[in-house]
Amino acid sequence: MNMLLLFLHEVINGERVTLTACSECVCPLQTSSSDDEYKCYCADTYSDCPGFCKKCKAEFGKYICLDLISPNDCVKPVSSSEAKQKMIKGERVTLTACSECVCPLRTSSSDEEYKCYCTDTYSDCPGFCKKCKAEFGKYICLDLISPNDCVKPVSSLEAKQNMIKEERVTLTACSECVCPLRTSSSDEEYKCYCTDTYSDCPGFCKTCKAEFGKYICLDLISPNDCVKPVSSWEARQKIKLLQGRE
């Protein structure tokens, strides 16, 4: 069994490896004596040769490699799509963070767990997350239904439109913003209730714009209009009240 097959075998049989796009590092190779420096196999082929991690750890919104297979075992570059398909064909895979996952439904007592519809444009077929977890301000998929259960690929835009039509609240890549209400002819603009836990007081977005798979606030009501910080759960309740009035 070559090292790639061994790697996939280990992943399938217990150790979960997060495979992400280049910006978050797919599989890093250690390139110096410093534990912080890696040569990363990027989804968009920025590196010459991929490496394979036995274990990956999320830290400050990025993924770092904890255990490396020797770079000498690297045979040839593999695209992100190929790598993901190999992982998916094996069994469960953790796909991506928020930019490719729509998390609208609260499914447990935890505010951080949702049913998620995955909209990963890098894979042939999106699939469906059983559970999604907020980690370092992003949402990651914890468990995927088999790709065989996927009928047809759905684009991120289609998925979002479906969520909006069903009047569900979509929590975006920006975990601090809830964007449920379409407010213009543009599919990318929404009324957003900001729940930024890093600021003293949330505030309210007049419009929100999708940019590079994340949502950014275009226009804020004065912070003076904000009375006190509210939790993500409270924000969603306020959104429901607003929806009921319109």
UniProtKB/Swiss-Prot annotation:
The keyword Repeat applies. Weak inhibitor of cysteine proteinases. SMART domains: BowB. Belongs to the protease inhibitor I67 family. Residues 1-19 form the signal peptide. Keywords: Disulfide bond, Protease inhibitor, Repeat, Signal. CDD domains: BBI. SUPFAM superfamilies: Bromelain inhibitor VI (cysteine protease inhibitor). One of its GO terms (cellular component) is extracellular region. Disulfide bonds join 22-42, 25-74, 27-40, 49-56, 53-65, 98-118, 101-150, 103-116, 125-132, 129-141, 174-194, 177-226, 179-192, 201-208, 205-217. Residues 31-35, 77-95, 107-111, 153-171, 183-187, 229-246 form a propeptide. One of its GO terms (molecular function) is serine-type endopeptidase inhibitor activity. This is Bromelain inhibitor. It comes from the Eukaryota. Each inhibitor is composed of two chains, designated A and B linked by three disulfide bonds.
